[in-house]
């Protein structure tokens, strides 16, 4: 894979909106500082869908997507728990454990998480396969939010633990303030037609990079068929 190095960050880069189509964030080493801060377009959420693709070779716990509020450090978190081999969504400081996934190292994985506050149900999709829907937490995610890639927030916007940091690559991050249909999620999984996130849009992403983070060309993927209907 031919990678075009666009940016090596040694400090904080000012926020900007950029089309990252065909690009990825690379987190090349284990730190408790390097991360990407994403700036969402709204504050209060009665429903959420978050999708992202990532690849890593680390054999330990790590966070992929971390949203915190002043009162809830795990407002919306996607976390891999290595000891039990579980993907753990955390919402409003509650947690559900999903085991049985073939979460291979050195392999790209597409993950989507959906949740709505009315029913309090969460569901994850991993590489096109859905989990069961389980109760996690009802009630809205309210107030100011901070969203981070590459670290897990133990405090609002900080409290990073090097042993929970992400090492690898992340791409195609989208966030919606509603639950995507199963067909829309399958289209995301296959990298086909997709309505981009209305909260976070990879094609017009407002972000800041902090520490040792690279922006590189992502590998060419082989598209699957479009889900219609």
Predicted regions and their residues:
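Extracellular glycan-associated modules
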Residues: 1-229
């Amino acid at each position: 894979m031919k990678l075009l190095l666009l940016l090596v960050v040694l400090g904080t880069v000012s926020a900007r909106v950029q089309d990252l189509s065909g690009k990825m964030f690379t987190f090349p080493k284990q730190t408790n500082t390097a991360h990407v801060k994403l700036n969402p377009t709204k504050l209060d959420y009665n429903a959420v869908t978050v999708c992202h693709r990532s690849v890593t070779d680390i054999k330990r716990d790590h966070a992929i997507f971390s949203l915190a509020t002043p009162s809830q450090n795990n407002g919306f978190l996607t976390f891999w728990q290595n000891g039990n081999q579980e993907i753990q969504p955390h919402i409003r400081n509650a947690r559900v454990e999903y085991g049985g996934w073939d979460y291979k190292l050195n392999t790209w994985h597409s993950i989507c998480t959906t949740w709505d506050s009315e029913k309090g149900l969460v569901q994850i999709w991993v590489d096109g396969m859905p989990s069961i829907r389980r109760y996690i937490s009802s009630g809205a995610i309210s107030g100011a939010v901070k969203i981070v890639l590459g670290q897990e927030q133990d405090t609002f916007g900080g409290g990073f633990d090097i042993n929970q940091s992400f090492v690898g690559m992340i791409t195609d991050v989208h966030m919606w303030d509603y639950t995507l249909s199963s067909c829309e999620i399958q289209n995301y999984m296959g990298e086909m037609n997709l309505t981009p996130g209305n909260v976070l849009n990879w094609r017009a992403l407002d972000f800041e990079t902090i520490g040792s983070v690279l922006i590189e060309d992502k590998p060419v993927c082989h598209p699957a068929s479009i889900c219609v209907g």
